């Protein structure tokens, strides 16, 4: 009897279950009421009483082993069938359209700005967003008590108090111009795009972080007329040939004389509305002739060289071009808004 059990044990262990057909064959051969294991249980009555207990335990172990092999094989085949079903490609199903991203309106405008100015001969320069006060204020002719140096206007970074230098998030890209003038000799013709930071209340017209593009031209005999020609050429290419410009006297510590430039309102075409505060004009940039003190700070002789500088908000220009009435929409990443710029 023990020999028959050992023989059947080896037979069960060597039985290969590779399909549902062989699984059913295994069940019919060993596990049904008239199977091989059941037949051995029927022969248990012929075993001597002394051996019956031990033989019964062997038969129970054999039956448990066979049942476990059957269940494991059944689970494996079911899992394999499910996996194959998931991998089947139904060519009759409709295809899935891939989502196509689009260029952000600010990046579109910035790209156009770069293209316009590089066509005029300007090179592109960049600099760090984390700046020191020397480049952000001192060398730009900001007086020590200027409001822009206060914490309510600027994000200052607290480092080692022993350092003694002001470290801040730059409030404009003008520090890049300073670095260029310190590193290069005239003639200099560059634009400086990048992100800047202001400690301002967030509203439909202002944000605490925005994109700016500044320009600088230093050479002999540069005049305000050259500045106006550059601004006019840029505005016509950016906003269309019919756009009207207005130069207003202004003040900036780093330029003298200084001006602010307005264009006709994109919503009312100069008739007056709530966006332009009934004036018919919208400011796009500030500009002026580089102050002699700034040139001296950078080792450039103001008696020999002169130059102009200008700066504009890329985000505000995007609002003008695409007739968007809230700057916050440019930073919210709302797909419903961004989808409108998909090409």
Swiss-Prot record:
Keyword Zinc-finger, does the record have it? no
Q: Which residues bind Mg(2+)?
A: 256
Where are the membrane-spanning stretches?
none
Note accompanying the cofactor annotation: Binds 2 magnesium ions per tetramer.
Superkingdom as given in the UniProt entry: Bacteria
Catalyzed reactions per annotation: tRNA(Phe) + L-phenylalanine + ATP = L-phenylalanyl-tRNA(Phe) + AMP + diphosphate + H(+)
Q: What class of enzyme is it?
A: ligase
Please give the chief subcellular localization of this protein.
Answer: cytoplasm
Q: Name one GO molecular function term.
A: magnesium ion binding
Q: Which Pfam families match?
A: Phe_tRNA-synt_N, tRNA-synt_2d
- Looking at the keywords, is Cell membrane present? no
User: Record's Gene Ontology CC terms?
Assistant: cytoplasm
Q: Per UniProt, which keywords does this protein have?
A: Aminoacyl-tRNA synthetase, ATP-binding, Cytoplasm, Ligase, Magnesium, Metal-binding, Nucleotide-binding, Protein biosynthesis
Q: Which CDD domains match?
A: PheRS_alpha_core
Per its Swiss-Prot or TrEMBL entry, what cofactor is needed? Mg(2+)
Under InterPro entries, the record lists: aa-tRNA-synth_II, aa-tRNA-synth_II/BPL/LPL, Phe-tRNA-synth_IIc_asu, Phe-tRNA_ligase_II_N, Phe_tRNA_ligase_alpha1_bac, Phenylalanyl-tRNA_Synthase, tRNA-bd_arm
Q: How does it assemble?
A: Tetramer of two alpha and two beta subunits.
Query: Which family does the similarity line name?
Result: Belongs to the class-II aminoacyl-tRNA synthetase family. Phe-tRNA synthetase alpha subunit type 1 subfamily.
Designated name of the protein: Phenylalanine--tRNA ligase alpha subunit
């Amino acid at each position: 009897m023990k020999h028959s059990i050992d023989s059947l044990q080896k037979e069960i262990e060597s039985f290969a279950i590779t399909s549902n057909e062989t699984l059913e064959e295994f069940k019919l051969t060993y596990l049904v009421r008239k199977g091989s294991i059941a037949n051995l249980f029927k022969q248990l009555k012929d075993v001597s009483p002394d051996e019956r207990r031990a033989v019964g335990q062997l038969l129970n172990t054999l039956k448990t082993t066979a049942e476990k092999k059957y269940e494991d094989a059944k689970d494996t085949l079911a899992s394999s069938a499910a996996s194959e079903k998931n991998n089947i490609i139904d060519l009759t199903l409709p295809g899935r359209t891939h989502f196509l991203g689009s260029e952000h309106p600010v990046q579109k405008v910035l790209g156009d700005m770069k293209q316009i100015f590089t066509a005029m001969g300007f090179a592109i320069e960049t600099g760090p967003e984390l700046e020191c006060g020397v480049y952000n204020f001192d060398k730009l002719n900001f007086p020590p008590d200027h409001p822009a140096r206060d914490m309510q206007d600027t994000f200052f970074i607290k480092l080692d108090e022993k350092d003694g230098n002001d470290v801040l998030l730059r409030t404009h890209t003008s520090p890049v111009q300073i670095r260029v003038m310190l590193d290069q000799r005239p003639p200099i013709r560059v634009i400086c795009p990048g992100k800047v930071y202001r400690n301002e209340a967030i509203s439909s017209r202002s944000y605490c972080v925005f994109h700016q593009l500044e320009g600088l031209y230093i050479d002999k005999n540069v005049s305000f007329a050259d500045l106006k020609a550059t601004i006019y050429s840029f505005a016509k290419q950016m906003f269309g040939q019919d756009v009207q410009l207005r130069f207003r006297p202004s003040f900036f510590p780093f330029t003298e004389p200084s001006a602010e430039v307005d264009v006709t309102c994109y919503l009312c075409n100069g008739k007056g509305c709530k966006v332009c505060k009934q004036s018919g004009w919208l400011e796009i940039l500030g500009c002026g002739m580089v102050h002699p003190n700034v040139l001296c700070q950078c080792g450039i002789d103001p008696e020999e060289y002169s130059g102009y500088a200008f700066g504009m908000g890329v985000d505000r220009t995007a609002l003008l071009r695409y007739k968007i009435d809230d700057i916050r929409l440019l930073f919210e990443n709302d797909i419903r808004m961004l989808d409108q710029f998909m090409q």
